[in-house]
Regions:
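SF2 helicase/translocase ATPase core recognition
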Residues: 11-43, 164-198
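Conserved catalytic network of the ASCE P-loop NTPase/AAA+ motor domain
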Residues: 102-104, 153-157, 173-175
């Protein structure tokens, strides 16, 4: 029985209350709301701009709702890159996260993005807002050795900002000196997300 039994535990079971997860609600601006409305009301007309047809009308119809949800998730992260956006150069969530870093996180912080597009946007914006703070970027196309060097440089700073894709830094990477992690967008898979911030 012992050879065939595997005990699993969740991080929270042995970490207890050593961490705090806070959720922040950000009210979207008019330009962002316009993008959301366009996706909800005119998806059939704009679908071909974002997704390639399978060549089979039945498959395309079956995928329509999933694709609409995928585009809505993308719009919640980077609405300024989609058709119909008419607003500030950077969405409100980007500005909210920058203000959160400015007012509440004077030390190291990691910002985890779900897409490279979002990572590039946050890198650009946080670079503009915090020119005095060291800024580091990691994504999946960077080799593991290079990632380790970037993390070592980040560890040496007192107030560095690390912007990365959530998939690029998972459980195999440990940054013990960074106590603050911001997820700009949630993933479908909660355990994968937990691999990033734990």
């Amino acid at each position: 029985l012992i050879k065939k039994t595997i005990l699993t535990r969740k991080f929270k079971e042995f970490a207890a209350d050593k961490y705090e997860i806070r959720h922040h609600a950000v009210i979207p601006g008019p330009g962002e709301k316009a993008v959301y409305a366009k996706i909800l009301k005119e998806f059939c007309e704009i679908c071909s701009f974002y997704f390639t047809s399978t060549g089979d009308a039945k498959k395309d119809a079956a995928l329509r709702l999933v694709r609409q949800i995928m585009l809505m998730i993308r719009a919640c992260s980077t609405p300024n890159t989609l058709a119909g956006y008419d607003g500030e150069p950077f969405p409100r969530k980007t500005r909210y996260i920058a203000n959160l870093i400015k007012t509440e996180i004077p030390t190291k912080v990691a910002v985890g993005c779900t897409t490279i597009e979002a990572m590039n946007m946050y890198t650009d914006y946080l670079g503009l807002m915090f020119p005095e703070r060291p800024l580091f970027t990691i994504h999946g196309e960077i080799s593991f050795e290079r990632r380790q060097k970037i993390i070592a440089q980040f560890e040496e700073t007192a107030d560095g900002i690390l912007v990365c894709t959530q998939q690029a830094l998972k459980s195999s990477t440990n940054i013990p000196s960074c106590d603050d992690v911001i997820l700009e967008s949630l993933q479908w898979n909660i355990p994968k997300m937990e691999q990033f911030y734990f």
